[in-house]
Amino acid sequence: MGFLTHSAFLRRSSSSIALLACFLCLAPALSHSQQDVLTYHNNNSRNGLNSKETILTLANVNSATFGKLFTVTVDGRVDAQPLYLHAVSTANGTQNLLIVVSEHDSAYAFNADTGALVWQATALKTGETPSDDRGCGQVSPEIGITSTPVIDRPKNSNGVIYLVAMSKYSSGNYHQRLHALDAATGNELHNGPVDISATYPGTGDNSSGGVVIFDPAQYKERSGLLLIDDTVYLAWASHCDDRPYTGWIMGYKASTLAQTTVLNVTPNGNEGAIWGAGAGLTADADNNIYFLDANGYFDSTLNAGGFPSEGDYGNAFLKLSTKGGLAVTDYFEMFNQESENGSDTDLGSGGALLLPAMKDAQGNLWDLAVGAGKDSNLYVVNRNGMGGFNSTNKMYQELAGALPGGIWSMPAYFDSRLYYGPVGQPILEFAFKSAKLLPSPVAQTVKAFAYPGATPSISANGDADAIVWASENSNPAVLHAFNAKTLVELYNSNQASGGRDQFGAGNKFIIPTIANGKVYVGTTTGVGAFGLLP
């Protein structure tokens, strides 16, 4: 028994716009180039960029011409990034769809231009509820669908939505399941769902007889799902670092939901969860995967190849090959990893971002990635030689202390500029020159963002009209828009009088989704939709 669905007519909050205004909003969306948002932060590089936004410009994003269009209400907190599908063939005609999931184990498709409910589905089986918060306030009061889904949409198809849902039987048993939903109907596909289970050779936490066992009660799927080469990859975080737990990555064949590969990155140790403030695993064009592992055991005894002899990679920047199954092929570990692990100043609170190939002053091309965590340092690694573990850090570049307050978020990238939102700090804009970061930010916002900082998204029309968007975790939540070059504020949702653009309470790790002239932002009760006012 999979998702149970029903269709519905228009459902909007009291702040929804009038029917005529909805029609006016719909018209431009159908007349411009249509862009899907199918995965966390727009693409597998996780750069947060929609470079084909032709409607929103530096000139029209202001409180006089831009604002809230409608809100949609769901049955739980929205922790995952909303996704967007254009021109889906539904029972009521061709529609642009906004895909939203909740911590109450529900998935929704709304008309992305009007807010009308197209379908709603539940992941719960008879006798089940969403998981309780496991005594941990990180995701509370219930745990259902936490991570951002991923959508597979081959040409001329409606698309398949892959998501992970956590639930609990009245008997007390916990389940994690992978679902595949028809984007047009919400109906289950590929004989789904499948219960998620795994084992891996090792003697670490929750092992028996030389095998580590995945216990679904001990984990939550925080990391956005990754789809490459017909495989959906999942990565697992713990509940408040409550042992026993280890670092799991799993792959499932997208077309069958059969498990095809499993890797544990702390199999003979403990901890090493994958958080990333909800960031998805990152992948390059050769299907290598990159991520930042959290505090956990690192085996500093290295083998002849320079890798931990026991295969334990706590608090590391990791590269995995997917050819023939998951395997660690490169890594970077801080020289002071033991101290960072003990003081909980690990890398795991941030996500990894892949940069486009860059040319240095000598004409050499570099394939780079960036990452940062709780220690306030900004790390740039060479993806073809990340640095390993040494008595001093030997990665490509380190900006020590560049991110005061630490990172519990994901950066964004556009046109040789890198944008980070540290805790309690402004959004900082760093510039690359000759394949190196300049040592100090070239711009920053006036606004500082309280915990967990900000994860920016960027819209642009090619190299023009670039706008940095960010959501503020406050009550009410605030959507901000900044000129991407200067970080001068263009708009925020508190500017209009009478609370015109307020859209609900904020939530941590929220990421604005920009598609076809609209901006969608999650809250504790639903999603606010913004665009040009009628």
Question: Can you annotate each of these PLM segments?
Answer:
Residues 329, 499-501:
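Blade-edge motifs of beta-propeller repeat domains
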Residues 29-33:
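Sec/Tat signal peptide C-region and signal peptidase I cleavage site
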Residues 494-498:
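Contiguous ligand/interfacial binding patches
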Residues 1-12:
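N-terminal secretory signal peptides that target proteins for export/translocation
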Residues 427-450:
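Flexible internal linker/loop segments at domain or repeat junctions
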Residues 390-403, 441-446:
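Inter-blade linker and blade-boundary elements of WD-repeat/beta-propeller domains
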Residues 35-359, 364-389, 407-430, 453-460, ...:
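Mobile, glycine-rich extracellular loop/lid and propeptide segments
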Residues 15-27:
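Bacterial N-terminal signal peptides
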